[in-house]
């Protein structure tokens, strides 16, 4: 399942309080909620410069591949599920090419989300291509507590483009 949004972000982190102040003038209750979340997580609010919505994943995929080809510094990705197929194979081919050009390429995937679709051996193969790949939030059968799993699909390219 590919979420259909491309976000261009303004990453002036010092602007967090300024953004909350602007939001407060429009919606005081929402600004209070955002401030609480920002304070609790340590992540400041950032102002969205622009966003593009894709109604179908295929359109987003074509745009994402084009943007990956432009990467100069880094590509960071986080996925709940990794599974070999057209999407991942195409993205990995581009990432491997960029890694060979000196781009820092990293992928994290949820251990449980990918338990039946992606193995540690698959992750090691990415390492051979210059892509740093690690599972996170390992699934432990002996844990009986609730876990903090999400279904994120995030790709950041050179801190200026995010596909969510």
Question: Can you say where each PLM-predicted feature lies in the sequence?
Answer:
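N-terminal localization/anchoring segments of enzymes in phospholipid and broader phosphate metabolism
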Residues: 1-162
């Amino acid at each position: 399942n590919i979420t259909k949004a491309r976000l261009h972000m303004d990453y002036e982190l010092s602007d967090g309080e300024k953004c909350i102040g602007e939001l407060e003038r429009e919606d005081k209750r929402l600004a209070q909620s955002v401030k609480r979340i920002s304070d609790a997580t340590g992540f400041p609010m950032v102002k969205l410069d622009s966003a593009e919505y894709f109604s179908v994943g295929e359109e987003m995929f074509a745009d994402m591949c084009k943007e990956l080809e432009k990467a100069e510094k880094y590509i960071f990705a986080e996925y709940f599920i990794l599974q070999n197929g057209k999407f991942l194979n195409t993205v990995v081919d581009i990432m491997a090419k960029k890694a060979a050009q000196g781009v820092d390429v990293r992928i994290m995937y949820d251990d449980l989300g990918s338990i039946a679709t992606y193995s540690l051996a698959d992750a090691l193969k990415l390492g051979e291509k210059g892509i740093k790949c690690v599972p996170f939030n390992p699934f432990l059968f002996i844990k009986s507590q609730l876990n903090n799993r999400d279904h994120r699909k995030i790709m950041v390219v050179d801190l200026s483009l995010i596909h969510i």
